[in-house]
Amino acid sequence: MNRESKVFIESPILKEAILNTFKKLHPFLQAKNPVMFIVFLGALFTTWIFFKDLYYGVYSSFNLQISLWLWFTVLFANFAEAIAEGRGKARTDSLKKTRSNIIAKKLVGNKIENVPGTLLKIGDIVICEAGDLIPGDGEILEGIASVDESAITGESAPVVRESGGDRSAVTGGTKVLSDRIKISITAEQGRTFLDQMIALVEGAKRQKTPNEIALTMLLSGLSFIFLIAVMSLPLFAEFVAKEGGQSANLSIPILISLLVCLIPTTIAGLLSAIGISGMERLIRFNVISKSGRAIEAAGDIDILLLDKTGTITLGNREARDFYPAKGVDEKYLADVAQLSSLADETPEGRSIVILAKDKFGIRERNLSEMEGEFIPFSASTKMSGVNLKKEGKVVRKIRKGAGDSIRNYLHTLGQKISAELEETIQTISQRGSTPILITEEDRLLGVIELKDIVKGGLKERFASLRKMGIRTVMITGDNPLTAAAIAAEAGVDDFLAEATPETKLKKIREQQAKGYLVAMIGDGTNDAPALAQSDVGVAMNTGTQTAREAGNMIDLDSNPSKLIEIVEIGKQLLMTRGALTTFSIANDVAKYFAILPALFGSFYAVSEVGPLSALNLMKLGSQKSAVLSAVIFNALVIPALIPLALRGIVYKPLGADRILKRNLLIFGLGGMVIPFLGIKCIDLMLGFLGII
């Protein structure tokens, strides 16, 4: 999967970025980046010196060129940030087009009123039919529909949304293609999922991450040290010059140029662009991150917790067969199972109704006509069912639930599961299916097999995660036998069976207490506490509203294997920042040895050449040529690295040691060699053109 644009910078983005480049020259905006603010002040000061000298009739070509190239340095850094913001803003503009004035069909009593979507409040009930735009975020209360979510996800294929289960959430701005659904609004206007997406992808509102703040403080500290060092140079030079009977020629523009070349302007100029582009690259993979911190954490995660239903499996467990107890007719079991599921709006419940109808021709019945009282599923009992009444009295009590819950239920009634059915339950579990038991009164009628379907391609994806050093753990409420079978089929490293929201939360806290960073993928309301606690919580877009609010990332494609791309982008972000920091500091070392010998080469000279000139390995033309060449190189290296900052360095699933050695060789050694070559080439060009 590759959503990278074929055109690296599109024309509209480029035009707006150029305009914003000059807008960012505002001193308040420049002060947010301490290193580049020094360059900004230096450009102002050298410009003032040039015009002051010009006012007194002194024209200095050198001072003019220094001023221009210092301004170019500031502008190139502004341009890098503006381009990164522009690429994210293009996505924002397309989302804003989706947010239009939608007329909602609000249900008031038994009547439908047409009202503007902007007036809807939490709890309002709306009706959406084929061709309608969904007016706001909500949960489907009744019905099933095919929905076009291309305006949000970019995917043209429609998706199914239905009441019950983990596919009940709908997003404002999407379009109903078929059928009719009743929706309860769950978000106020201005706080919808679409509004959140727009706010998140707007680069101007992006907050710096703790790592960015720490790196900015480090770069500021280095800049302060270089500032003190450069300020002391005139005193040192004056002392040495007097001792040798010479004069020191260190003008203020030369000192400012030296300072700008020594401070880490490269990484400082690209730092914001790297962070913004990390979020923008996620957006290209249809993942919305609520913070840059989540992206950074994704690059460092150690353990990935995966919810089974809807994440590893397709999420729609289907009833496959009925297994009656001894002495029970299979058709009777199917009839009772259907009765227990008539009011069950979950996909599993509906599949039981359909299986009974398809296999035995048992037609659906109206529970209200039968005086039926539906018993909804309870997290405490882990059972559901129905009480059938006659003249107000319960005459049939039917229950449906997992093995342990029915086992405990029968135990309270003085009954137990037969050895034959226990064997059936174990067999069903061992092949990765879920056994659901049906009882009537105190009698166990049999077992229904619900089959989980594992999503394709996961095994290979999890193998790639393993190479990255990430351990995968599947979390499920199923019994250990079923969990083990599905875990083996999916290829995860470990599993946690019979999990509850509390055990998920406990598992995450235990791993975090050991110093591990934990990522959690989920889509259900019961996943919300774990998603909120985890360092990286990726909620599926097909999941519930609660899950989407709890996670700090949302996968619009609802593809759990997308975490590999998320991890790669996180690692790319960290590695790109580290690599360019290494390159920038290595540049400073190289420029130090390039400029200082040229400045002080004539000191202690007996003739025209002093002993310090031996350090002038590059044999630069003159003092001014050396300084100007270094300033030009320092400015040009920023736009040269913009593509790398925006795209990120190439990541391969290698060991940390190999990656470190590789990047030190490329960006460390390369960062020292390239300035020598670049500055020398510029020096030769300046000499050839006669500019100095």
UniProtKB/Swiss-Prot annotation:
The active site is at 307 (4-aspartylphosphate intermediate). One of its GO terms (cellular component) is potassium ion-transporting ATPase complex. The keyword Nucleus does not apply. GO terms for molecular function: ATP binding; ATP hydrolysis activity; magnesium ion binding; P-type potassium transmembrane transporter activity. Mg(2+) binds at residues 523, 527. It catalyses: K(+)(out) + ATP + H2O = K(+)(in) + ADP + phosphate + H(+). Keywords: ATP-binding, Cell inner membrane, Cell membrane, Ion transport, Magnesium, Membrane, Metal-binding, Nucleotide-binding, Phosphoprotein, Potassium, Potassium transport, Translocase, Transmembrane, Transmembrane helix, Transport. It is a multi-pass membrane protein. It is found in: Cell inner membrane. ATP binds at residues 344, 348, 377-384, 400. The keyword Membrane applies. PROSITE patterns: ATPASE_E1_E2. The chain crosses the membrane at residues 35-55, 64-84, 213-233, 254-274, 592-612, 626-646, 672-692. Its EC number is 7.2.2.6. It comes from the Bacteria. It is an enzyme of class 7 (translocase). Belongs to the cation transport ATPase (P-type) (TC 3.A.3) family. Type IA subfamily. PANTHER family: POTASSIUM-TRANSPORTING ATPASE ATP-BINDING SUBUNIT. The system is composed of three essential subunits: KdpA, KdpB and KdpC. Part of the high-affinity ATP-driven potassium transport (or Kdp) system, which catalyzes the hydrolysis of ATP coupled with the electrogenic transport of potassium into the cytoplasm. This subunit is responsible for energy coupling to the transport system and for the release of the potassium ions to the cytoplasm. HAMAP family: KdpB. This is Potassium-transporting ATPase ATP-binding subunit. It comes from Leptospira interrogans serogroup Icterohaemorrhagiae serovar Lai (strain 56601). The lineage of its organism: Bacteria, Pseudomonadati, Spirochaetota, Spirochaetia, Leptospirales.
